[in-house]
Amino acid sequence: MNGKSQSIPEVRFEYSFLLSDQASEGLNNLWGDGTPLHSFEYYTGIAAKYEKWWQPDGDTIVAALCQITGLQFYQNTIDVHVAPWFNAFSSPMVLGVMFKKKDDLIITLTHEIIHRLLTDNTTYDRHYDFLKLWKSMFGEDHAWNTLVHIPVHAFLQELYIDVLDRPDLLELDKKSLESLDAKEYIAAWEYVEKTGYKTITDKIRKHVKEQRSDR
């Protein structure tokens, strides 16, 4: 177990030209309407817009996530790679170019940052079996994608309600998933609502403390 400690990581945004060249071009040819991708300047502008949207509240969000989880990020930088035709994922951290409003970006990026914090931190080994842990906490009858989103959604709700005082973000998050008919994500929210987000986050924090005491 690595005992490395560090401060809040810097979140940096960049248009990933290489990812776009190696993957987005092909995806555009496969799924697009024949319109070519936009220019380098267009996509760097989107990355800059995302950074501008994130900056006013970003450090507050990241610091709060460390506080409410009891975890510290292993890495001191989170590079957010922006490229067309991609949905969001956390490792590496990638965002598409579809966000039109600040709140949509905040919700999605915060979601992915929680994924990163829960699985790449200074408390647990990077190869720790989190699926086994979460099955023991939340049950074995969930779809994989539901299981991994139960802790994410619980901490999102704690952040939205108890830290940011933004219940509107909670509602926007749920409505966006409903509009996409994202059944496994919706099932995770339903579990959180039924169980209670504080029950879930308290259970995770307890395990974090136990994990530290065992080192």
Question: Each PLM stretch: what is its role?
Answer:
Residues M93-L109:
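Short pre-active-site segment immediately N-terminal to the catalytic Zn-binding motif
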Residues K52-D59, D103-D104, T108, H142-T146:
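Soluble non-cytosolic domains of exported or imported proteins
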Residues I46-Q55, G96, M137-A143:
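Second-shell loop/turn segments in exported
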Residues Q67, K132-R215:
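Metalloprotease/metallohydrolase-associated module, dominated by Zn2+-dependent proteases
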Residues D33-S91, E158-V163:
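Auxiliary, metal-adjacent structural segments of Zn-dependent hydrolase domains
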Residues N76-H81, D120-K132, D165-L170:
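Short acidic alpha-helical/loop segments enriched in Asp/Glu that coordinate divalent cations
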Residues I107-T123:
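Active-site recognition of the HExxH zinc-binding catalytic motif
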Residues M1-F40, T44, S213-D214:
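N-terminal low-structure segments adjacent to metalloprotease catalytic domains
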